[in-house]
């Protein structure tokens, strides 16, 4: 679905593949921020698929996490889901990982967050986090595509659009619940 992320994805890929990042073996950190259901995970999957790199998913703290990441002697993507929860007490550890001082090879760090309240040391240095993408309401194209793919009775399309239009926040989760309800009744 069209989540309005193509420009961001292309920019990230171009940066990752640039001579500066390749030759200097630089890590790249990005943040996808927004409430649940706005497309952060989908965007992460799209980016991972396009780069064709192994993906390490981190969703909880671990005592030897930095040692493990530093031991990886190949380029990879490190996806840290809900980073503000995963590293709630250990943001210094997160900084050390992204800095990559001891890395054998470069890493692309994707941090998803529901609330962007990470340490200023993380956000204040462009060498750590290069891009931040805010996810909000679904685009009209994403809404139409989802309805087209999932609504059984297409005559009820305008009814769903009316409900979605009245919402303050529209997410994939909310849209799915509405379409499911209409499909049931």
Predicted segments, located by residue:
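Pre-Walker A (pre-P-loop) alpha-helix and adjacent loop at the N terminus of AAA/AAA+ ATPase modules
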Residues: 1-28
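Walker A/P-loop nucleotide-binding motif
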Residues: 21-44
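Short loop/turn elements that form and flank the Walker-type P-loop nucleotide-binding site
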Residues: 25-26, 72-74, 103-106
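Hydrophobic positions in the central parallel beta-sheet of the AAA+
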Residues: 30, 78-81
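Conserved nucleotide-binding/hydrolysis micro-motifs of P-loop NTPases
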Residues: 62-63, 84-85, 114-119, 137-143
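Conserved catalytic/switch belt of AAA+ P-loop NTPases
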Residues: 84-131
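C-terminal alpha-helical "lid" subdomain
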Residues: 124-185
């Amino acid at each position: 679905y069209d989540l309005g992320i193509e420009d961001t994805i292309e920019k990230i890929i171009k940066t990752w593949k640039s001579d500066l990042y390749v030759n200097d073996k630089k890590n790249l950190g990005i943040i996808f921020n927004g409430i649940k259901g706005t497309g952060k995970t989908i965007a992460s999957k799209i980016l991972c698929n396009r780069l064709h790199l192994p993906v390490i998913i981190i969703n909880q703290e671990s005592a030897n996490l930095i040692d493990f990441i530093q031991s990886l002697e190949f380029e990879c993507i490190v996806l840290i889901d809900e980073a503000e929860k995963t590293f709630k007490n250990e943001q210094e550890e997160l900084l050390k990982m992204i800095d990559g001082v001891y890395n054998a090879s470069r890493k692309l760090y994707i941090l998803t967050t529901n609330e962007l309240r990470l340490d200023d040391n993380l956000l204040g240095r462009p060498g750590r986090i290069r891009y931040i993408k805010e996810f909000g309401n679904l685009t009209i194209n994403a809404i139409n595509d989802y309805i087209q793919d999932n609504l059984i009775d297409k005559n009820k399309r305008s009814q769903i659009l009316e409900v979605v239009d009245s919402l303050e926040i529209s997410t994939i989760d909310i849209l799915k619940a509405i379409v499911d309800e209409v499909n049931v009744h």
